[in-house]
Amino acid sequence: MADDSVLPSPSEITSLADSSVFDSKVAEMSKENLCLASTSNVDEEMPQVEARVIMVQDAGKQEELLKALKTIKIMEVPVIKIKESCPGKSEEKLIKSIINMEMKVPCVKMDSMEEFESLDSPEFENIFVVTDFQNSVFNDLYKADCRIVGPPVILNCAQRGEPLPFSCRPLYCTSMLNLVLCFTGFRKKEELVKLVTLVHHMGGVIRKECNSKVTHLVANCTQGEKFRVAVSLGTPIMKPEWIYKAWERRNEQCFCAAVDDFRNEFKVPPFQDCILSFLGFSDEEKHSMEEMTEMQGGSYLPVGDERCTHLIVEENTVKDLPFEPSKKLFVVKQEWFWGSIQMDARAGETMYLYEKANTPELKKSVSLLSLSTPNSNRKRRRLKETLAQLSRETDLSPFPPRKRPSAEHSLSIGSLLDISNTPESSIHYGETPKSCAKSSRSSTPVPPKQSARWQVAKELYQTESNYVNILATIIQLFQVPLEEEGQRGGPILAPEEIKTIFGSIPDIFDVHMKIKDDLEDLIANWDESRSIGDIFLKYAKDLVKTYPPFVNFFEMSKEMIIKCEKQKPRFHAFLKINQAKPECGRQSLVELLIRPVQRLPSVALLLNDLKKHTADENPDKSTLEKAIGSLKEVMTHINEDKRKTEAQKQIFDVVYEVDGCPANLLSSHRSLVQRVETVSLGEHPCDRGEQVTLFLFNDCLEIARKRHKVIGTFRSPHDRTRPPASLKHIHLMPLSQIKKVLDIRETEDCHNAFALLVRPPTEQANVLLSFQMTSEELPKESWLKMLCRHVANTICKADAENLMYVADPESFEVNTKDMDSTLSRASRAIKKTSKKVTRAFSFSKTPKRALRMALSSSHSSEGRSPPSSGKLAVSRLSSTSSLAGIPSPSLVSLPSFFERRSHTLSRSTTHLI
């Protein structure tokens, strides 16, 4: 912390400088006398002074402060040393520096200013700890040029193990340490003095001029030179409330006023003090922009109102203004509106002033030409191409006609024409990544007689060139700017959001750049015998590698764009600015990103057309067939991956919906088969009457109940990406644990009921789980057959029918009577409350005789169909003796199993991974 400077002085002395005296001397030094000097000799002669802390009034009564002071051993002290500058000259230099001095003297308490004279001694370097910077004692100490700090400084130094800092001004806390502030737009001197004082008390520094060293500009208006400089430098522009709110939090340890979460709340919005009006926009666009104006701190009025400060004009539709604007009114293009939102500050109007176009037709044609021709410095050639462009009737744009804004929201994969159906020539957009848009060969040798094969090959090259330029536009105008560091106003999107939106677009671009170059060489050196199929066979593996990740997640990419556009105004403005550029053809990012989805089918059609116009004796005939086959394999691979992706997405949806769902549910080999809504009929897996959802997977069954109370959250609704979990995890059961599926007969007291006979590996008894189906979409018979089939597949048995057993409800004491009655619901509520109070669980036993009969059936009826009702009595008698050596299937041991149902992982499910 050494800071050296010099000042003429009459003699060479060494002394300790009081903070205010030290600061005043430094301020009085002129630039003519100021030069640097070494401080290597500062420690040669140290003064005989002790460092001491004085606790003023309430500070001496706070035990936390006194305890913190015991851990602080060092204090920063200013030192001034005066010596001759050069031999033989009378001038002398004053050197200042900061040294660390050990605190050997214990702290002293001071209750009033009457004690100050006895404590103010030149033998001590005193630092006063004051809890209130507004009382009279503070003012008296400040007038006496004393070093003053607040309690937060002591606590922070003790926590971090740092010495007590030196400050030439009273320092209450360090929440604005290392911040350099500048002020603009304040007319009342009293308000400005108050703000400056608070900044100094929090450790901040004030600068008169706004330059690159200023970290924050505190503005009371959105005009002036300082404001424009801050905007150009990307300096955060803050409201005065930022300082006041930071001062309110002065006693919070480790609080920093510059953190984004706190600072962003007080940034000056782009349209503060602005009154906008909009001309030439559709009603939908105008309404959206008016809402955005209010969100960004501005207001709006009808066109022509004298109070308006800005008129936003849609330059593509407005040919003339309906009135003569006043000199105070800024008439700007819509790019100013979106640019201000994107940079999170009011942009300079001079760069976006609206100008009436005298010859819009010519201007449009020239702009189109500038996109489609190589850069050239020859005026004659440019003029010739311009005239040729004006004489053409076809539009050179590779994009289809602009859709209505409302159509963008209903965009789907099959809703747009492929790019290959529209272009007539190759279009270049200037510099692109890796020089992708380098000019094509200006003259392509045309055969004397253009064959049909050559025409199709040329069309294939032209569409490939246009497609590469579309990919280059996506990367150059959208992805690269979003990924750039040091964006004005901070990053527009998070890195994971950018990755989700663009995915493997750069990889797809690299592959098609190579294909385009090979096709360009083939067209430039055309020969009927040259193979086009070899080009696509050459890059078939690359296409398989790059396309599935993007196509499979296109819908997710589209959803991410829509979500971010709604939640992040800067991203919405960013898209609007780029969409208006000619490179995009006035198409949205979603419309551009659908091109890779459409490209491979389009190429396959062109290759088929090329094969039709290729002679049988041409070697390329068979090569084209292989190339078409390779493209079909890529598309098949995409479809298979998409199905897998959708299956995995379904599992993720279950994990998000079920609170406490086991992590081992996520597995690459697992897929969701069926979801069934039921009601529990027994005491297990949860209380009778509870709504239970069964998720059947190909190898396990997830059991979850409806949450009684949804988890609350303190997060903003705008930040929530998905609804809270509506279900609570009970148990994840491998299908191998299901020994029997019981189809309960339909009676007056029992409807749509079924049960599962389960044998957990950690238990020595069987468990009966009974349910009533509540969903009408899936018949009970279909559900039970589906369940039995997957259980049989899991245990590697072919006879799935033998897993099902038809039973009477009385045999297992199962009934659905009065499940929805008011009395039944009240009884269940009382029972549940009683369980919570007593912390006890009561388990009703399933009749042993019925369970013995069911278990005997599973052992003795291998390879036979379930017994009919007529033979049920005989079956019961014959099965009794066979169960003599089998432990009783009583549910006495159920508590040890189902009391663990709320655990996320259990020993019975860990092998599912």
From Swiss-Prot:
InterPro entries (alphabetical): BRCT_dom, BRCT_dom_sf, DBL_dom_sf, DH_dom, Ect2, ECT2_BRCT0, ECT2_PH, GDS_CDC24_CS
Coiled-coil intervals, chain numbering: none
GO biological process: one example: intracellular signal transduction
Induction: Up-regulated by phenobarbital in the nucleus and cytoplasm of the liver.
Residue span, DH domain: 452-641
MF GO annotations: GTPase activator activity; guanyl-nucleotide exchange factor activity; protein homodimerization activity; small GTPase binding
Domain annotation PH: ranges: 675-794
Cellular component GO terms, alphabetical: bicellular tight junction; cell-cell junction; centralspindlin complex; cleavage furrow; cytoplasm; cytosol; midbody; mitotic spindle
Motif Nuclear localization signal mapped to chain: 378-382, 401-405
Record note on quaternary structure: Homodimer. Homooligomer. Found in the centralspindlin complex. Interacts with NR1I3. Interacts (Thr-359 phosphorylated form) with PARD6A; the interaction is observed in cancer cells. Interacts (Thr-359 phosphorylated form) with PRKCI; the interaction is observed in cancer cells. Interacts with PKP4; the interaction is observed at the midbody.
Protein name: Protein ECT2
